[in-house]
């Protein structure tokens, strides 16, 4: 369900869930780069905690969502404990869930949300963009140098 606010922004809560403080770091980085973000929160799993405590804190974030808000959860590691906790909660909550989150992808997701895309559209687009968020810098610089020197055979596309 795509519900727009009067400003044309989709009502969507995004919850970052990770091992340790990675999700907090993502949150702080986005605030530094994009400014304060409404309806963006984070939950981290720490060594002294069990999965049930993590699930409880994730569930608390889900319950903070407004009735008309979609919920998009972004986890750090496929089949990691945070991922598994969210999957278990998906039995009781209608949430979207992407895993393998990183800074460039999160930035794209937040920008898409701000441009009125719903969670389903964001998930589809994020999967397409994911491959572009990791770069081989050595190859990039080598190919860039080759382009500057007039080598037409370099493989870089940027």
Language-model segment annotations:
Residues 2-72, 78-158:
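N-terminal loops that bind phosphate or other acidic moieties
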């Amino acid at each position: 369900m795509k519900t727009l606010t009067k400003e044309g922004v989709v009502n969507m809560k995004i919850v970052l869930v990770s091992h340790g403080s990675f999700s907090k770091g993502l949150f702080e980085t986005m605030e530094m780069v994009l400014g304060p973000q409404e309806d963006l929160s984070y939950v981290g799993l720490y060594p002294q905690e069990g999965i049930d405590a993590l699930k409880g804190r994730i569930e608390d974030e889900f319950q903070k969502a407004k009735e008309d808000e979609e919920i998009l959860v972004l986890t750090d590691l496929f089949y990691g404990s945070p991922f598994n906790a969210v999957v278990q909660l998906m039995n009781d909550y209608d949430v979207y869930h992407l895993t393998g989150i990183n800074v460039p992808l999160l930035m794209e997701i937040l920008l898409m949300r701000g441009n009125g895309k719903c969670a389903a559209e964001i998930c589809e687009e994020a999967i397409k963009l994911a491959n572009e968020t990791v770069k081989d810098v050595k190859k990039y610089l080598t190919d860039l140098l080759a382009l500057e020197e007039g080598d037409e055979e370099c493989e870089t596309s940027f």
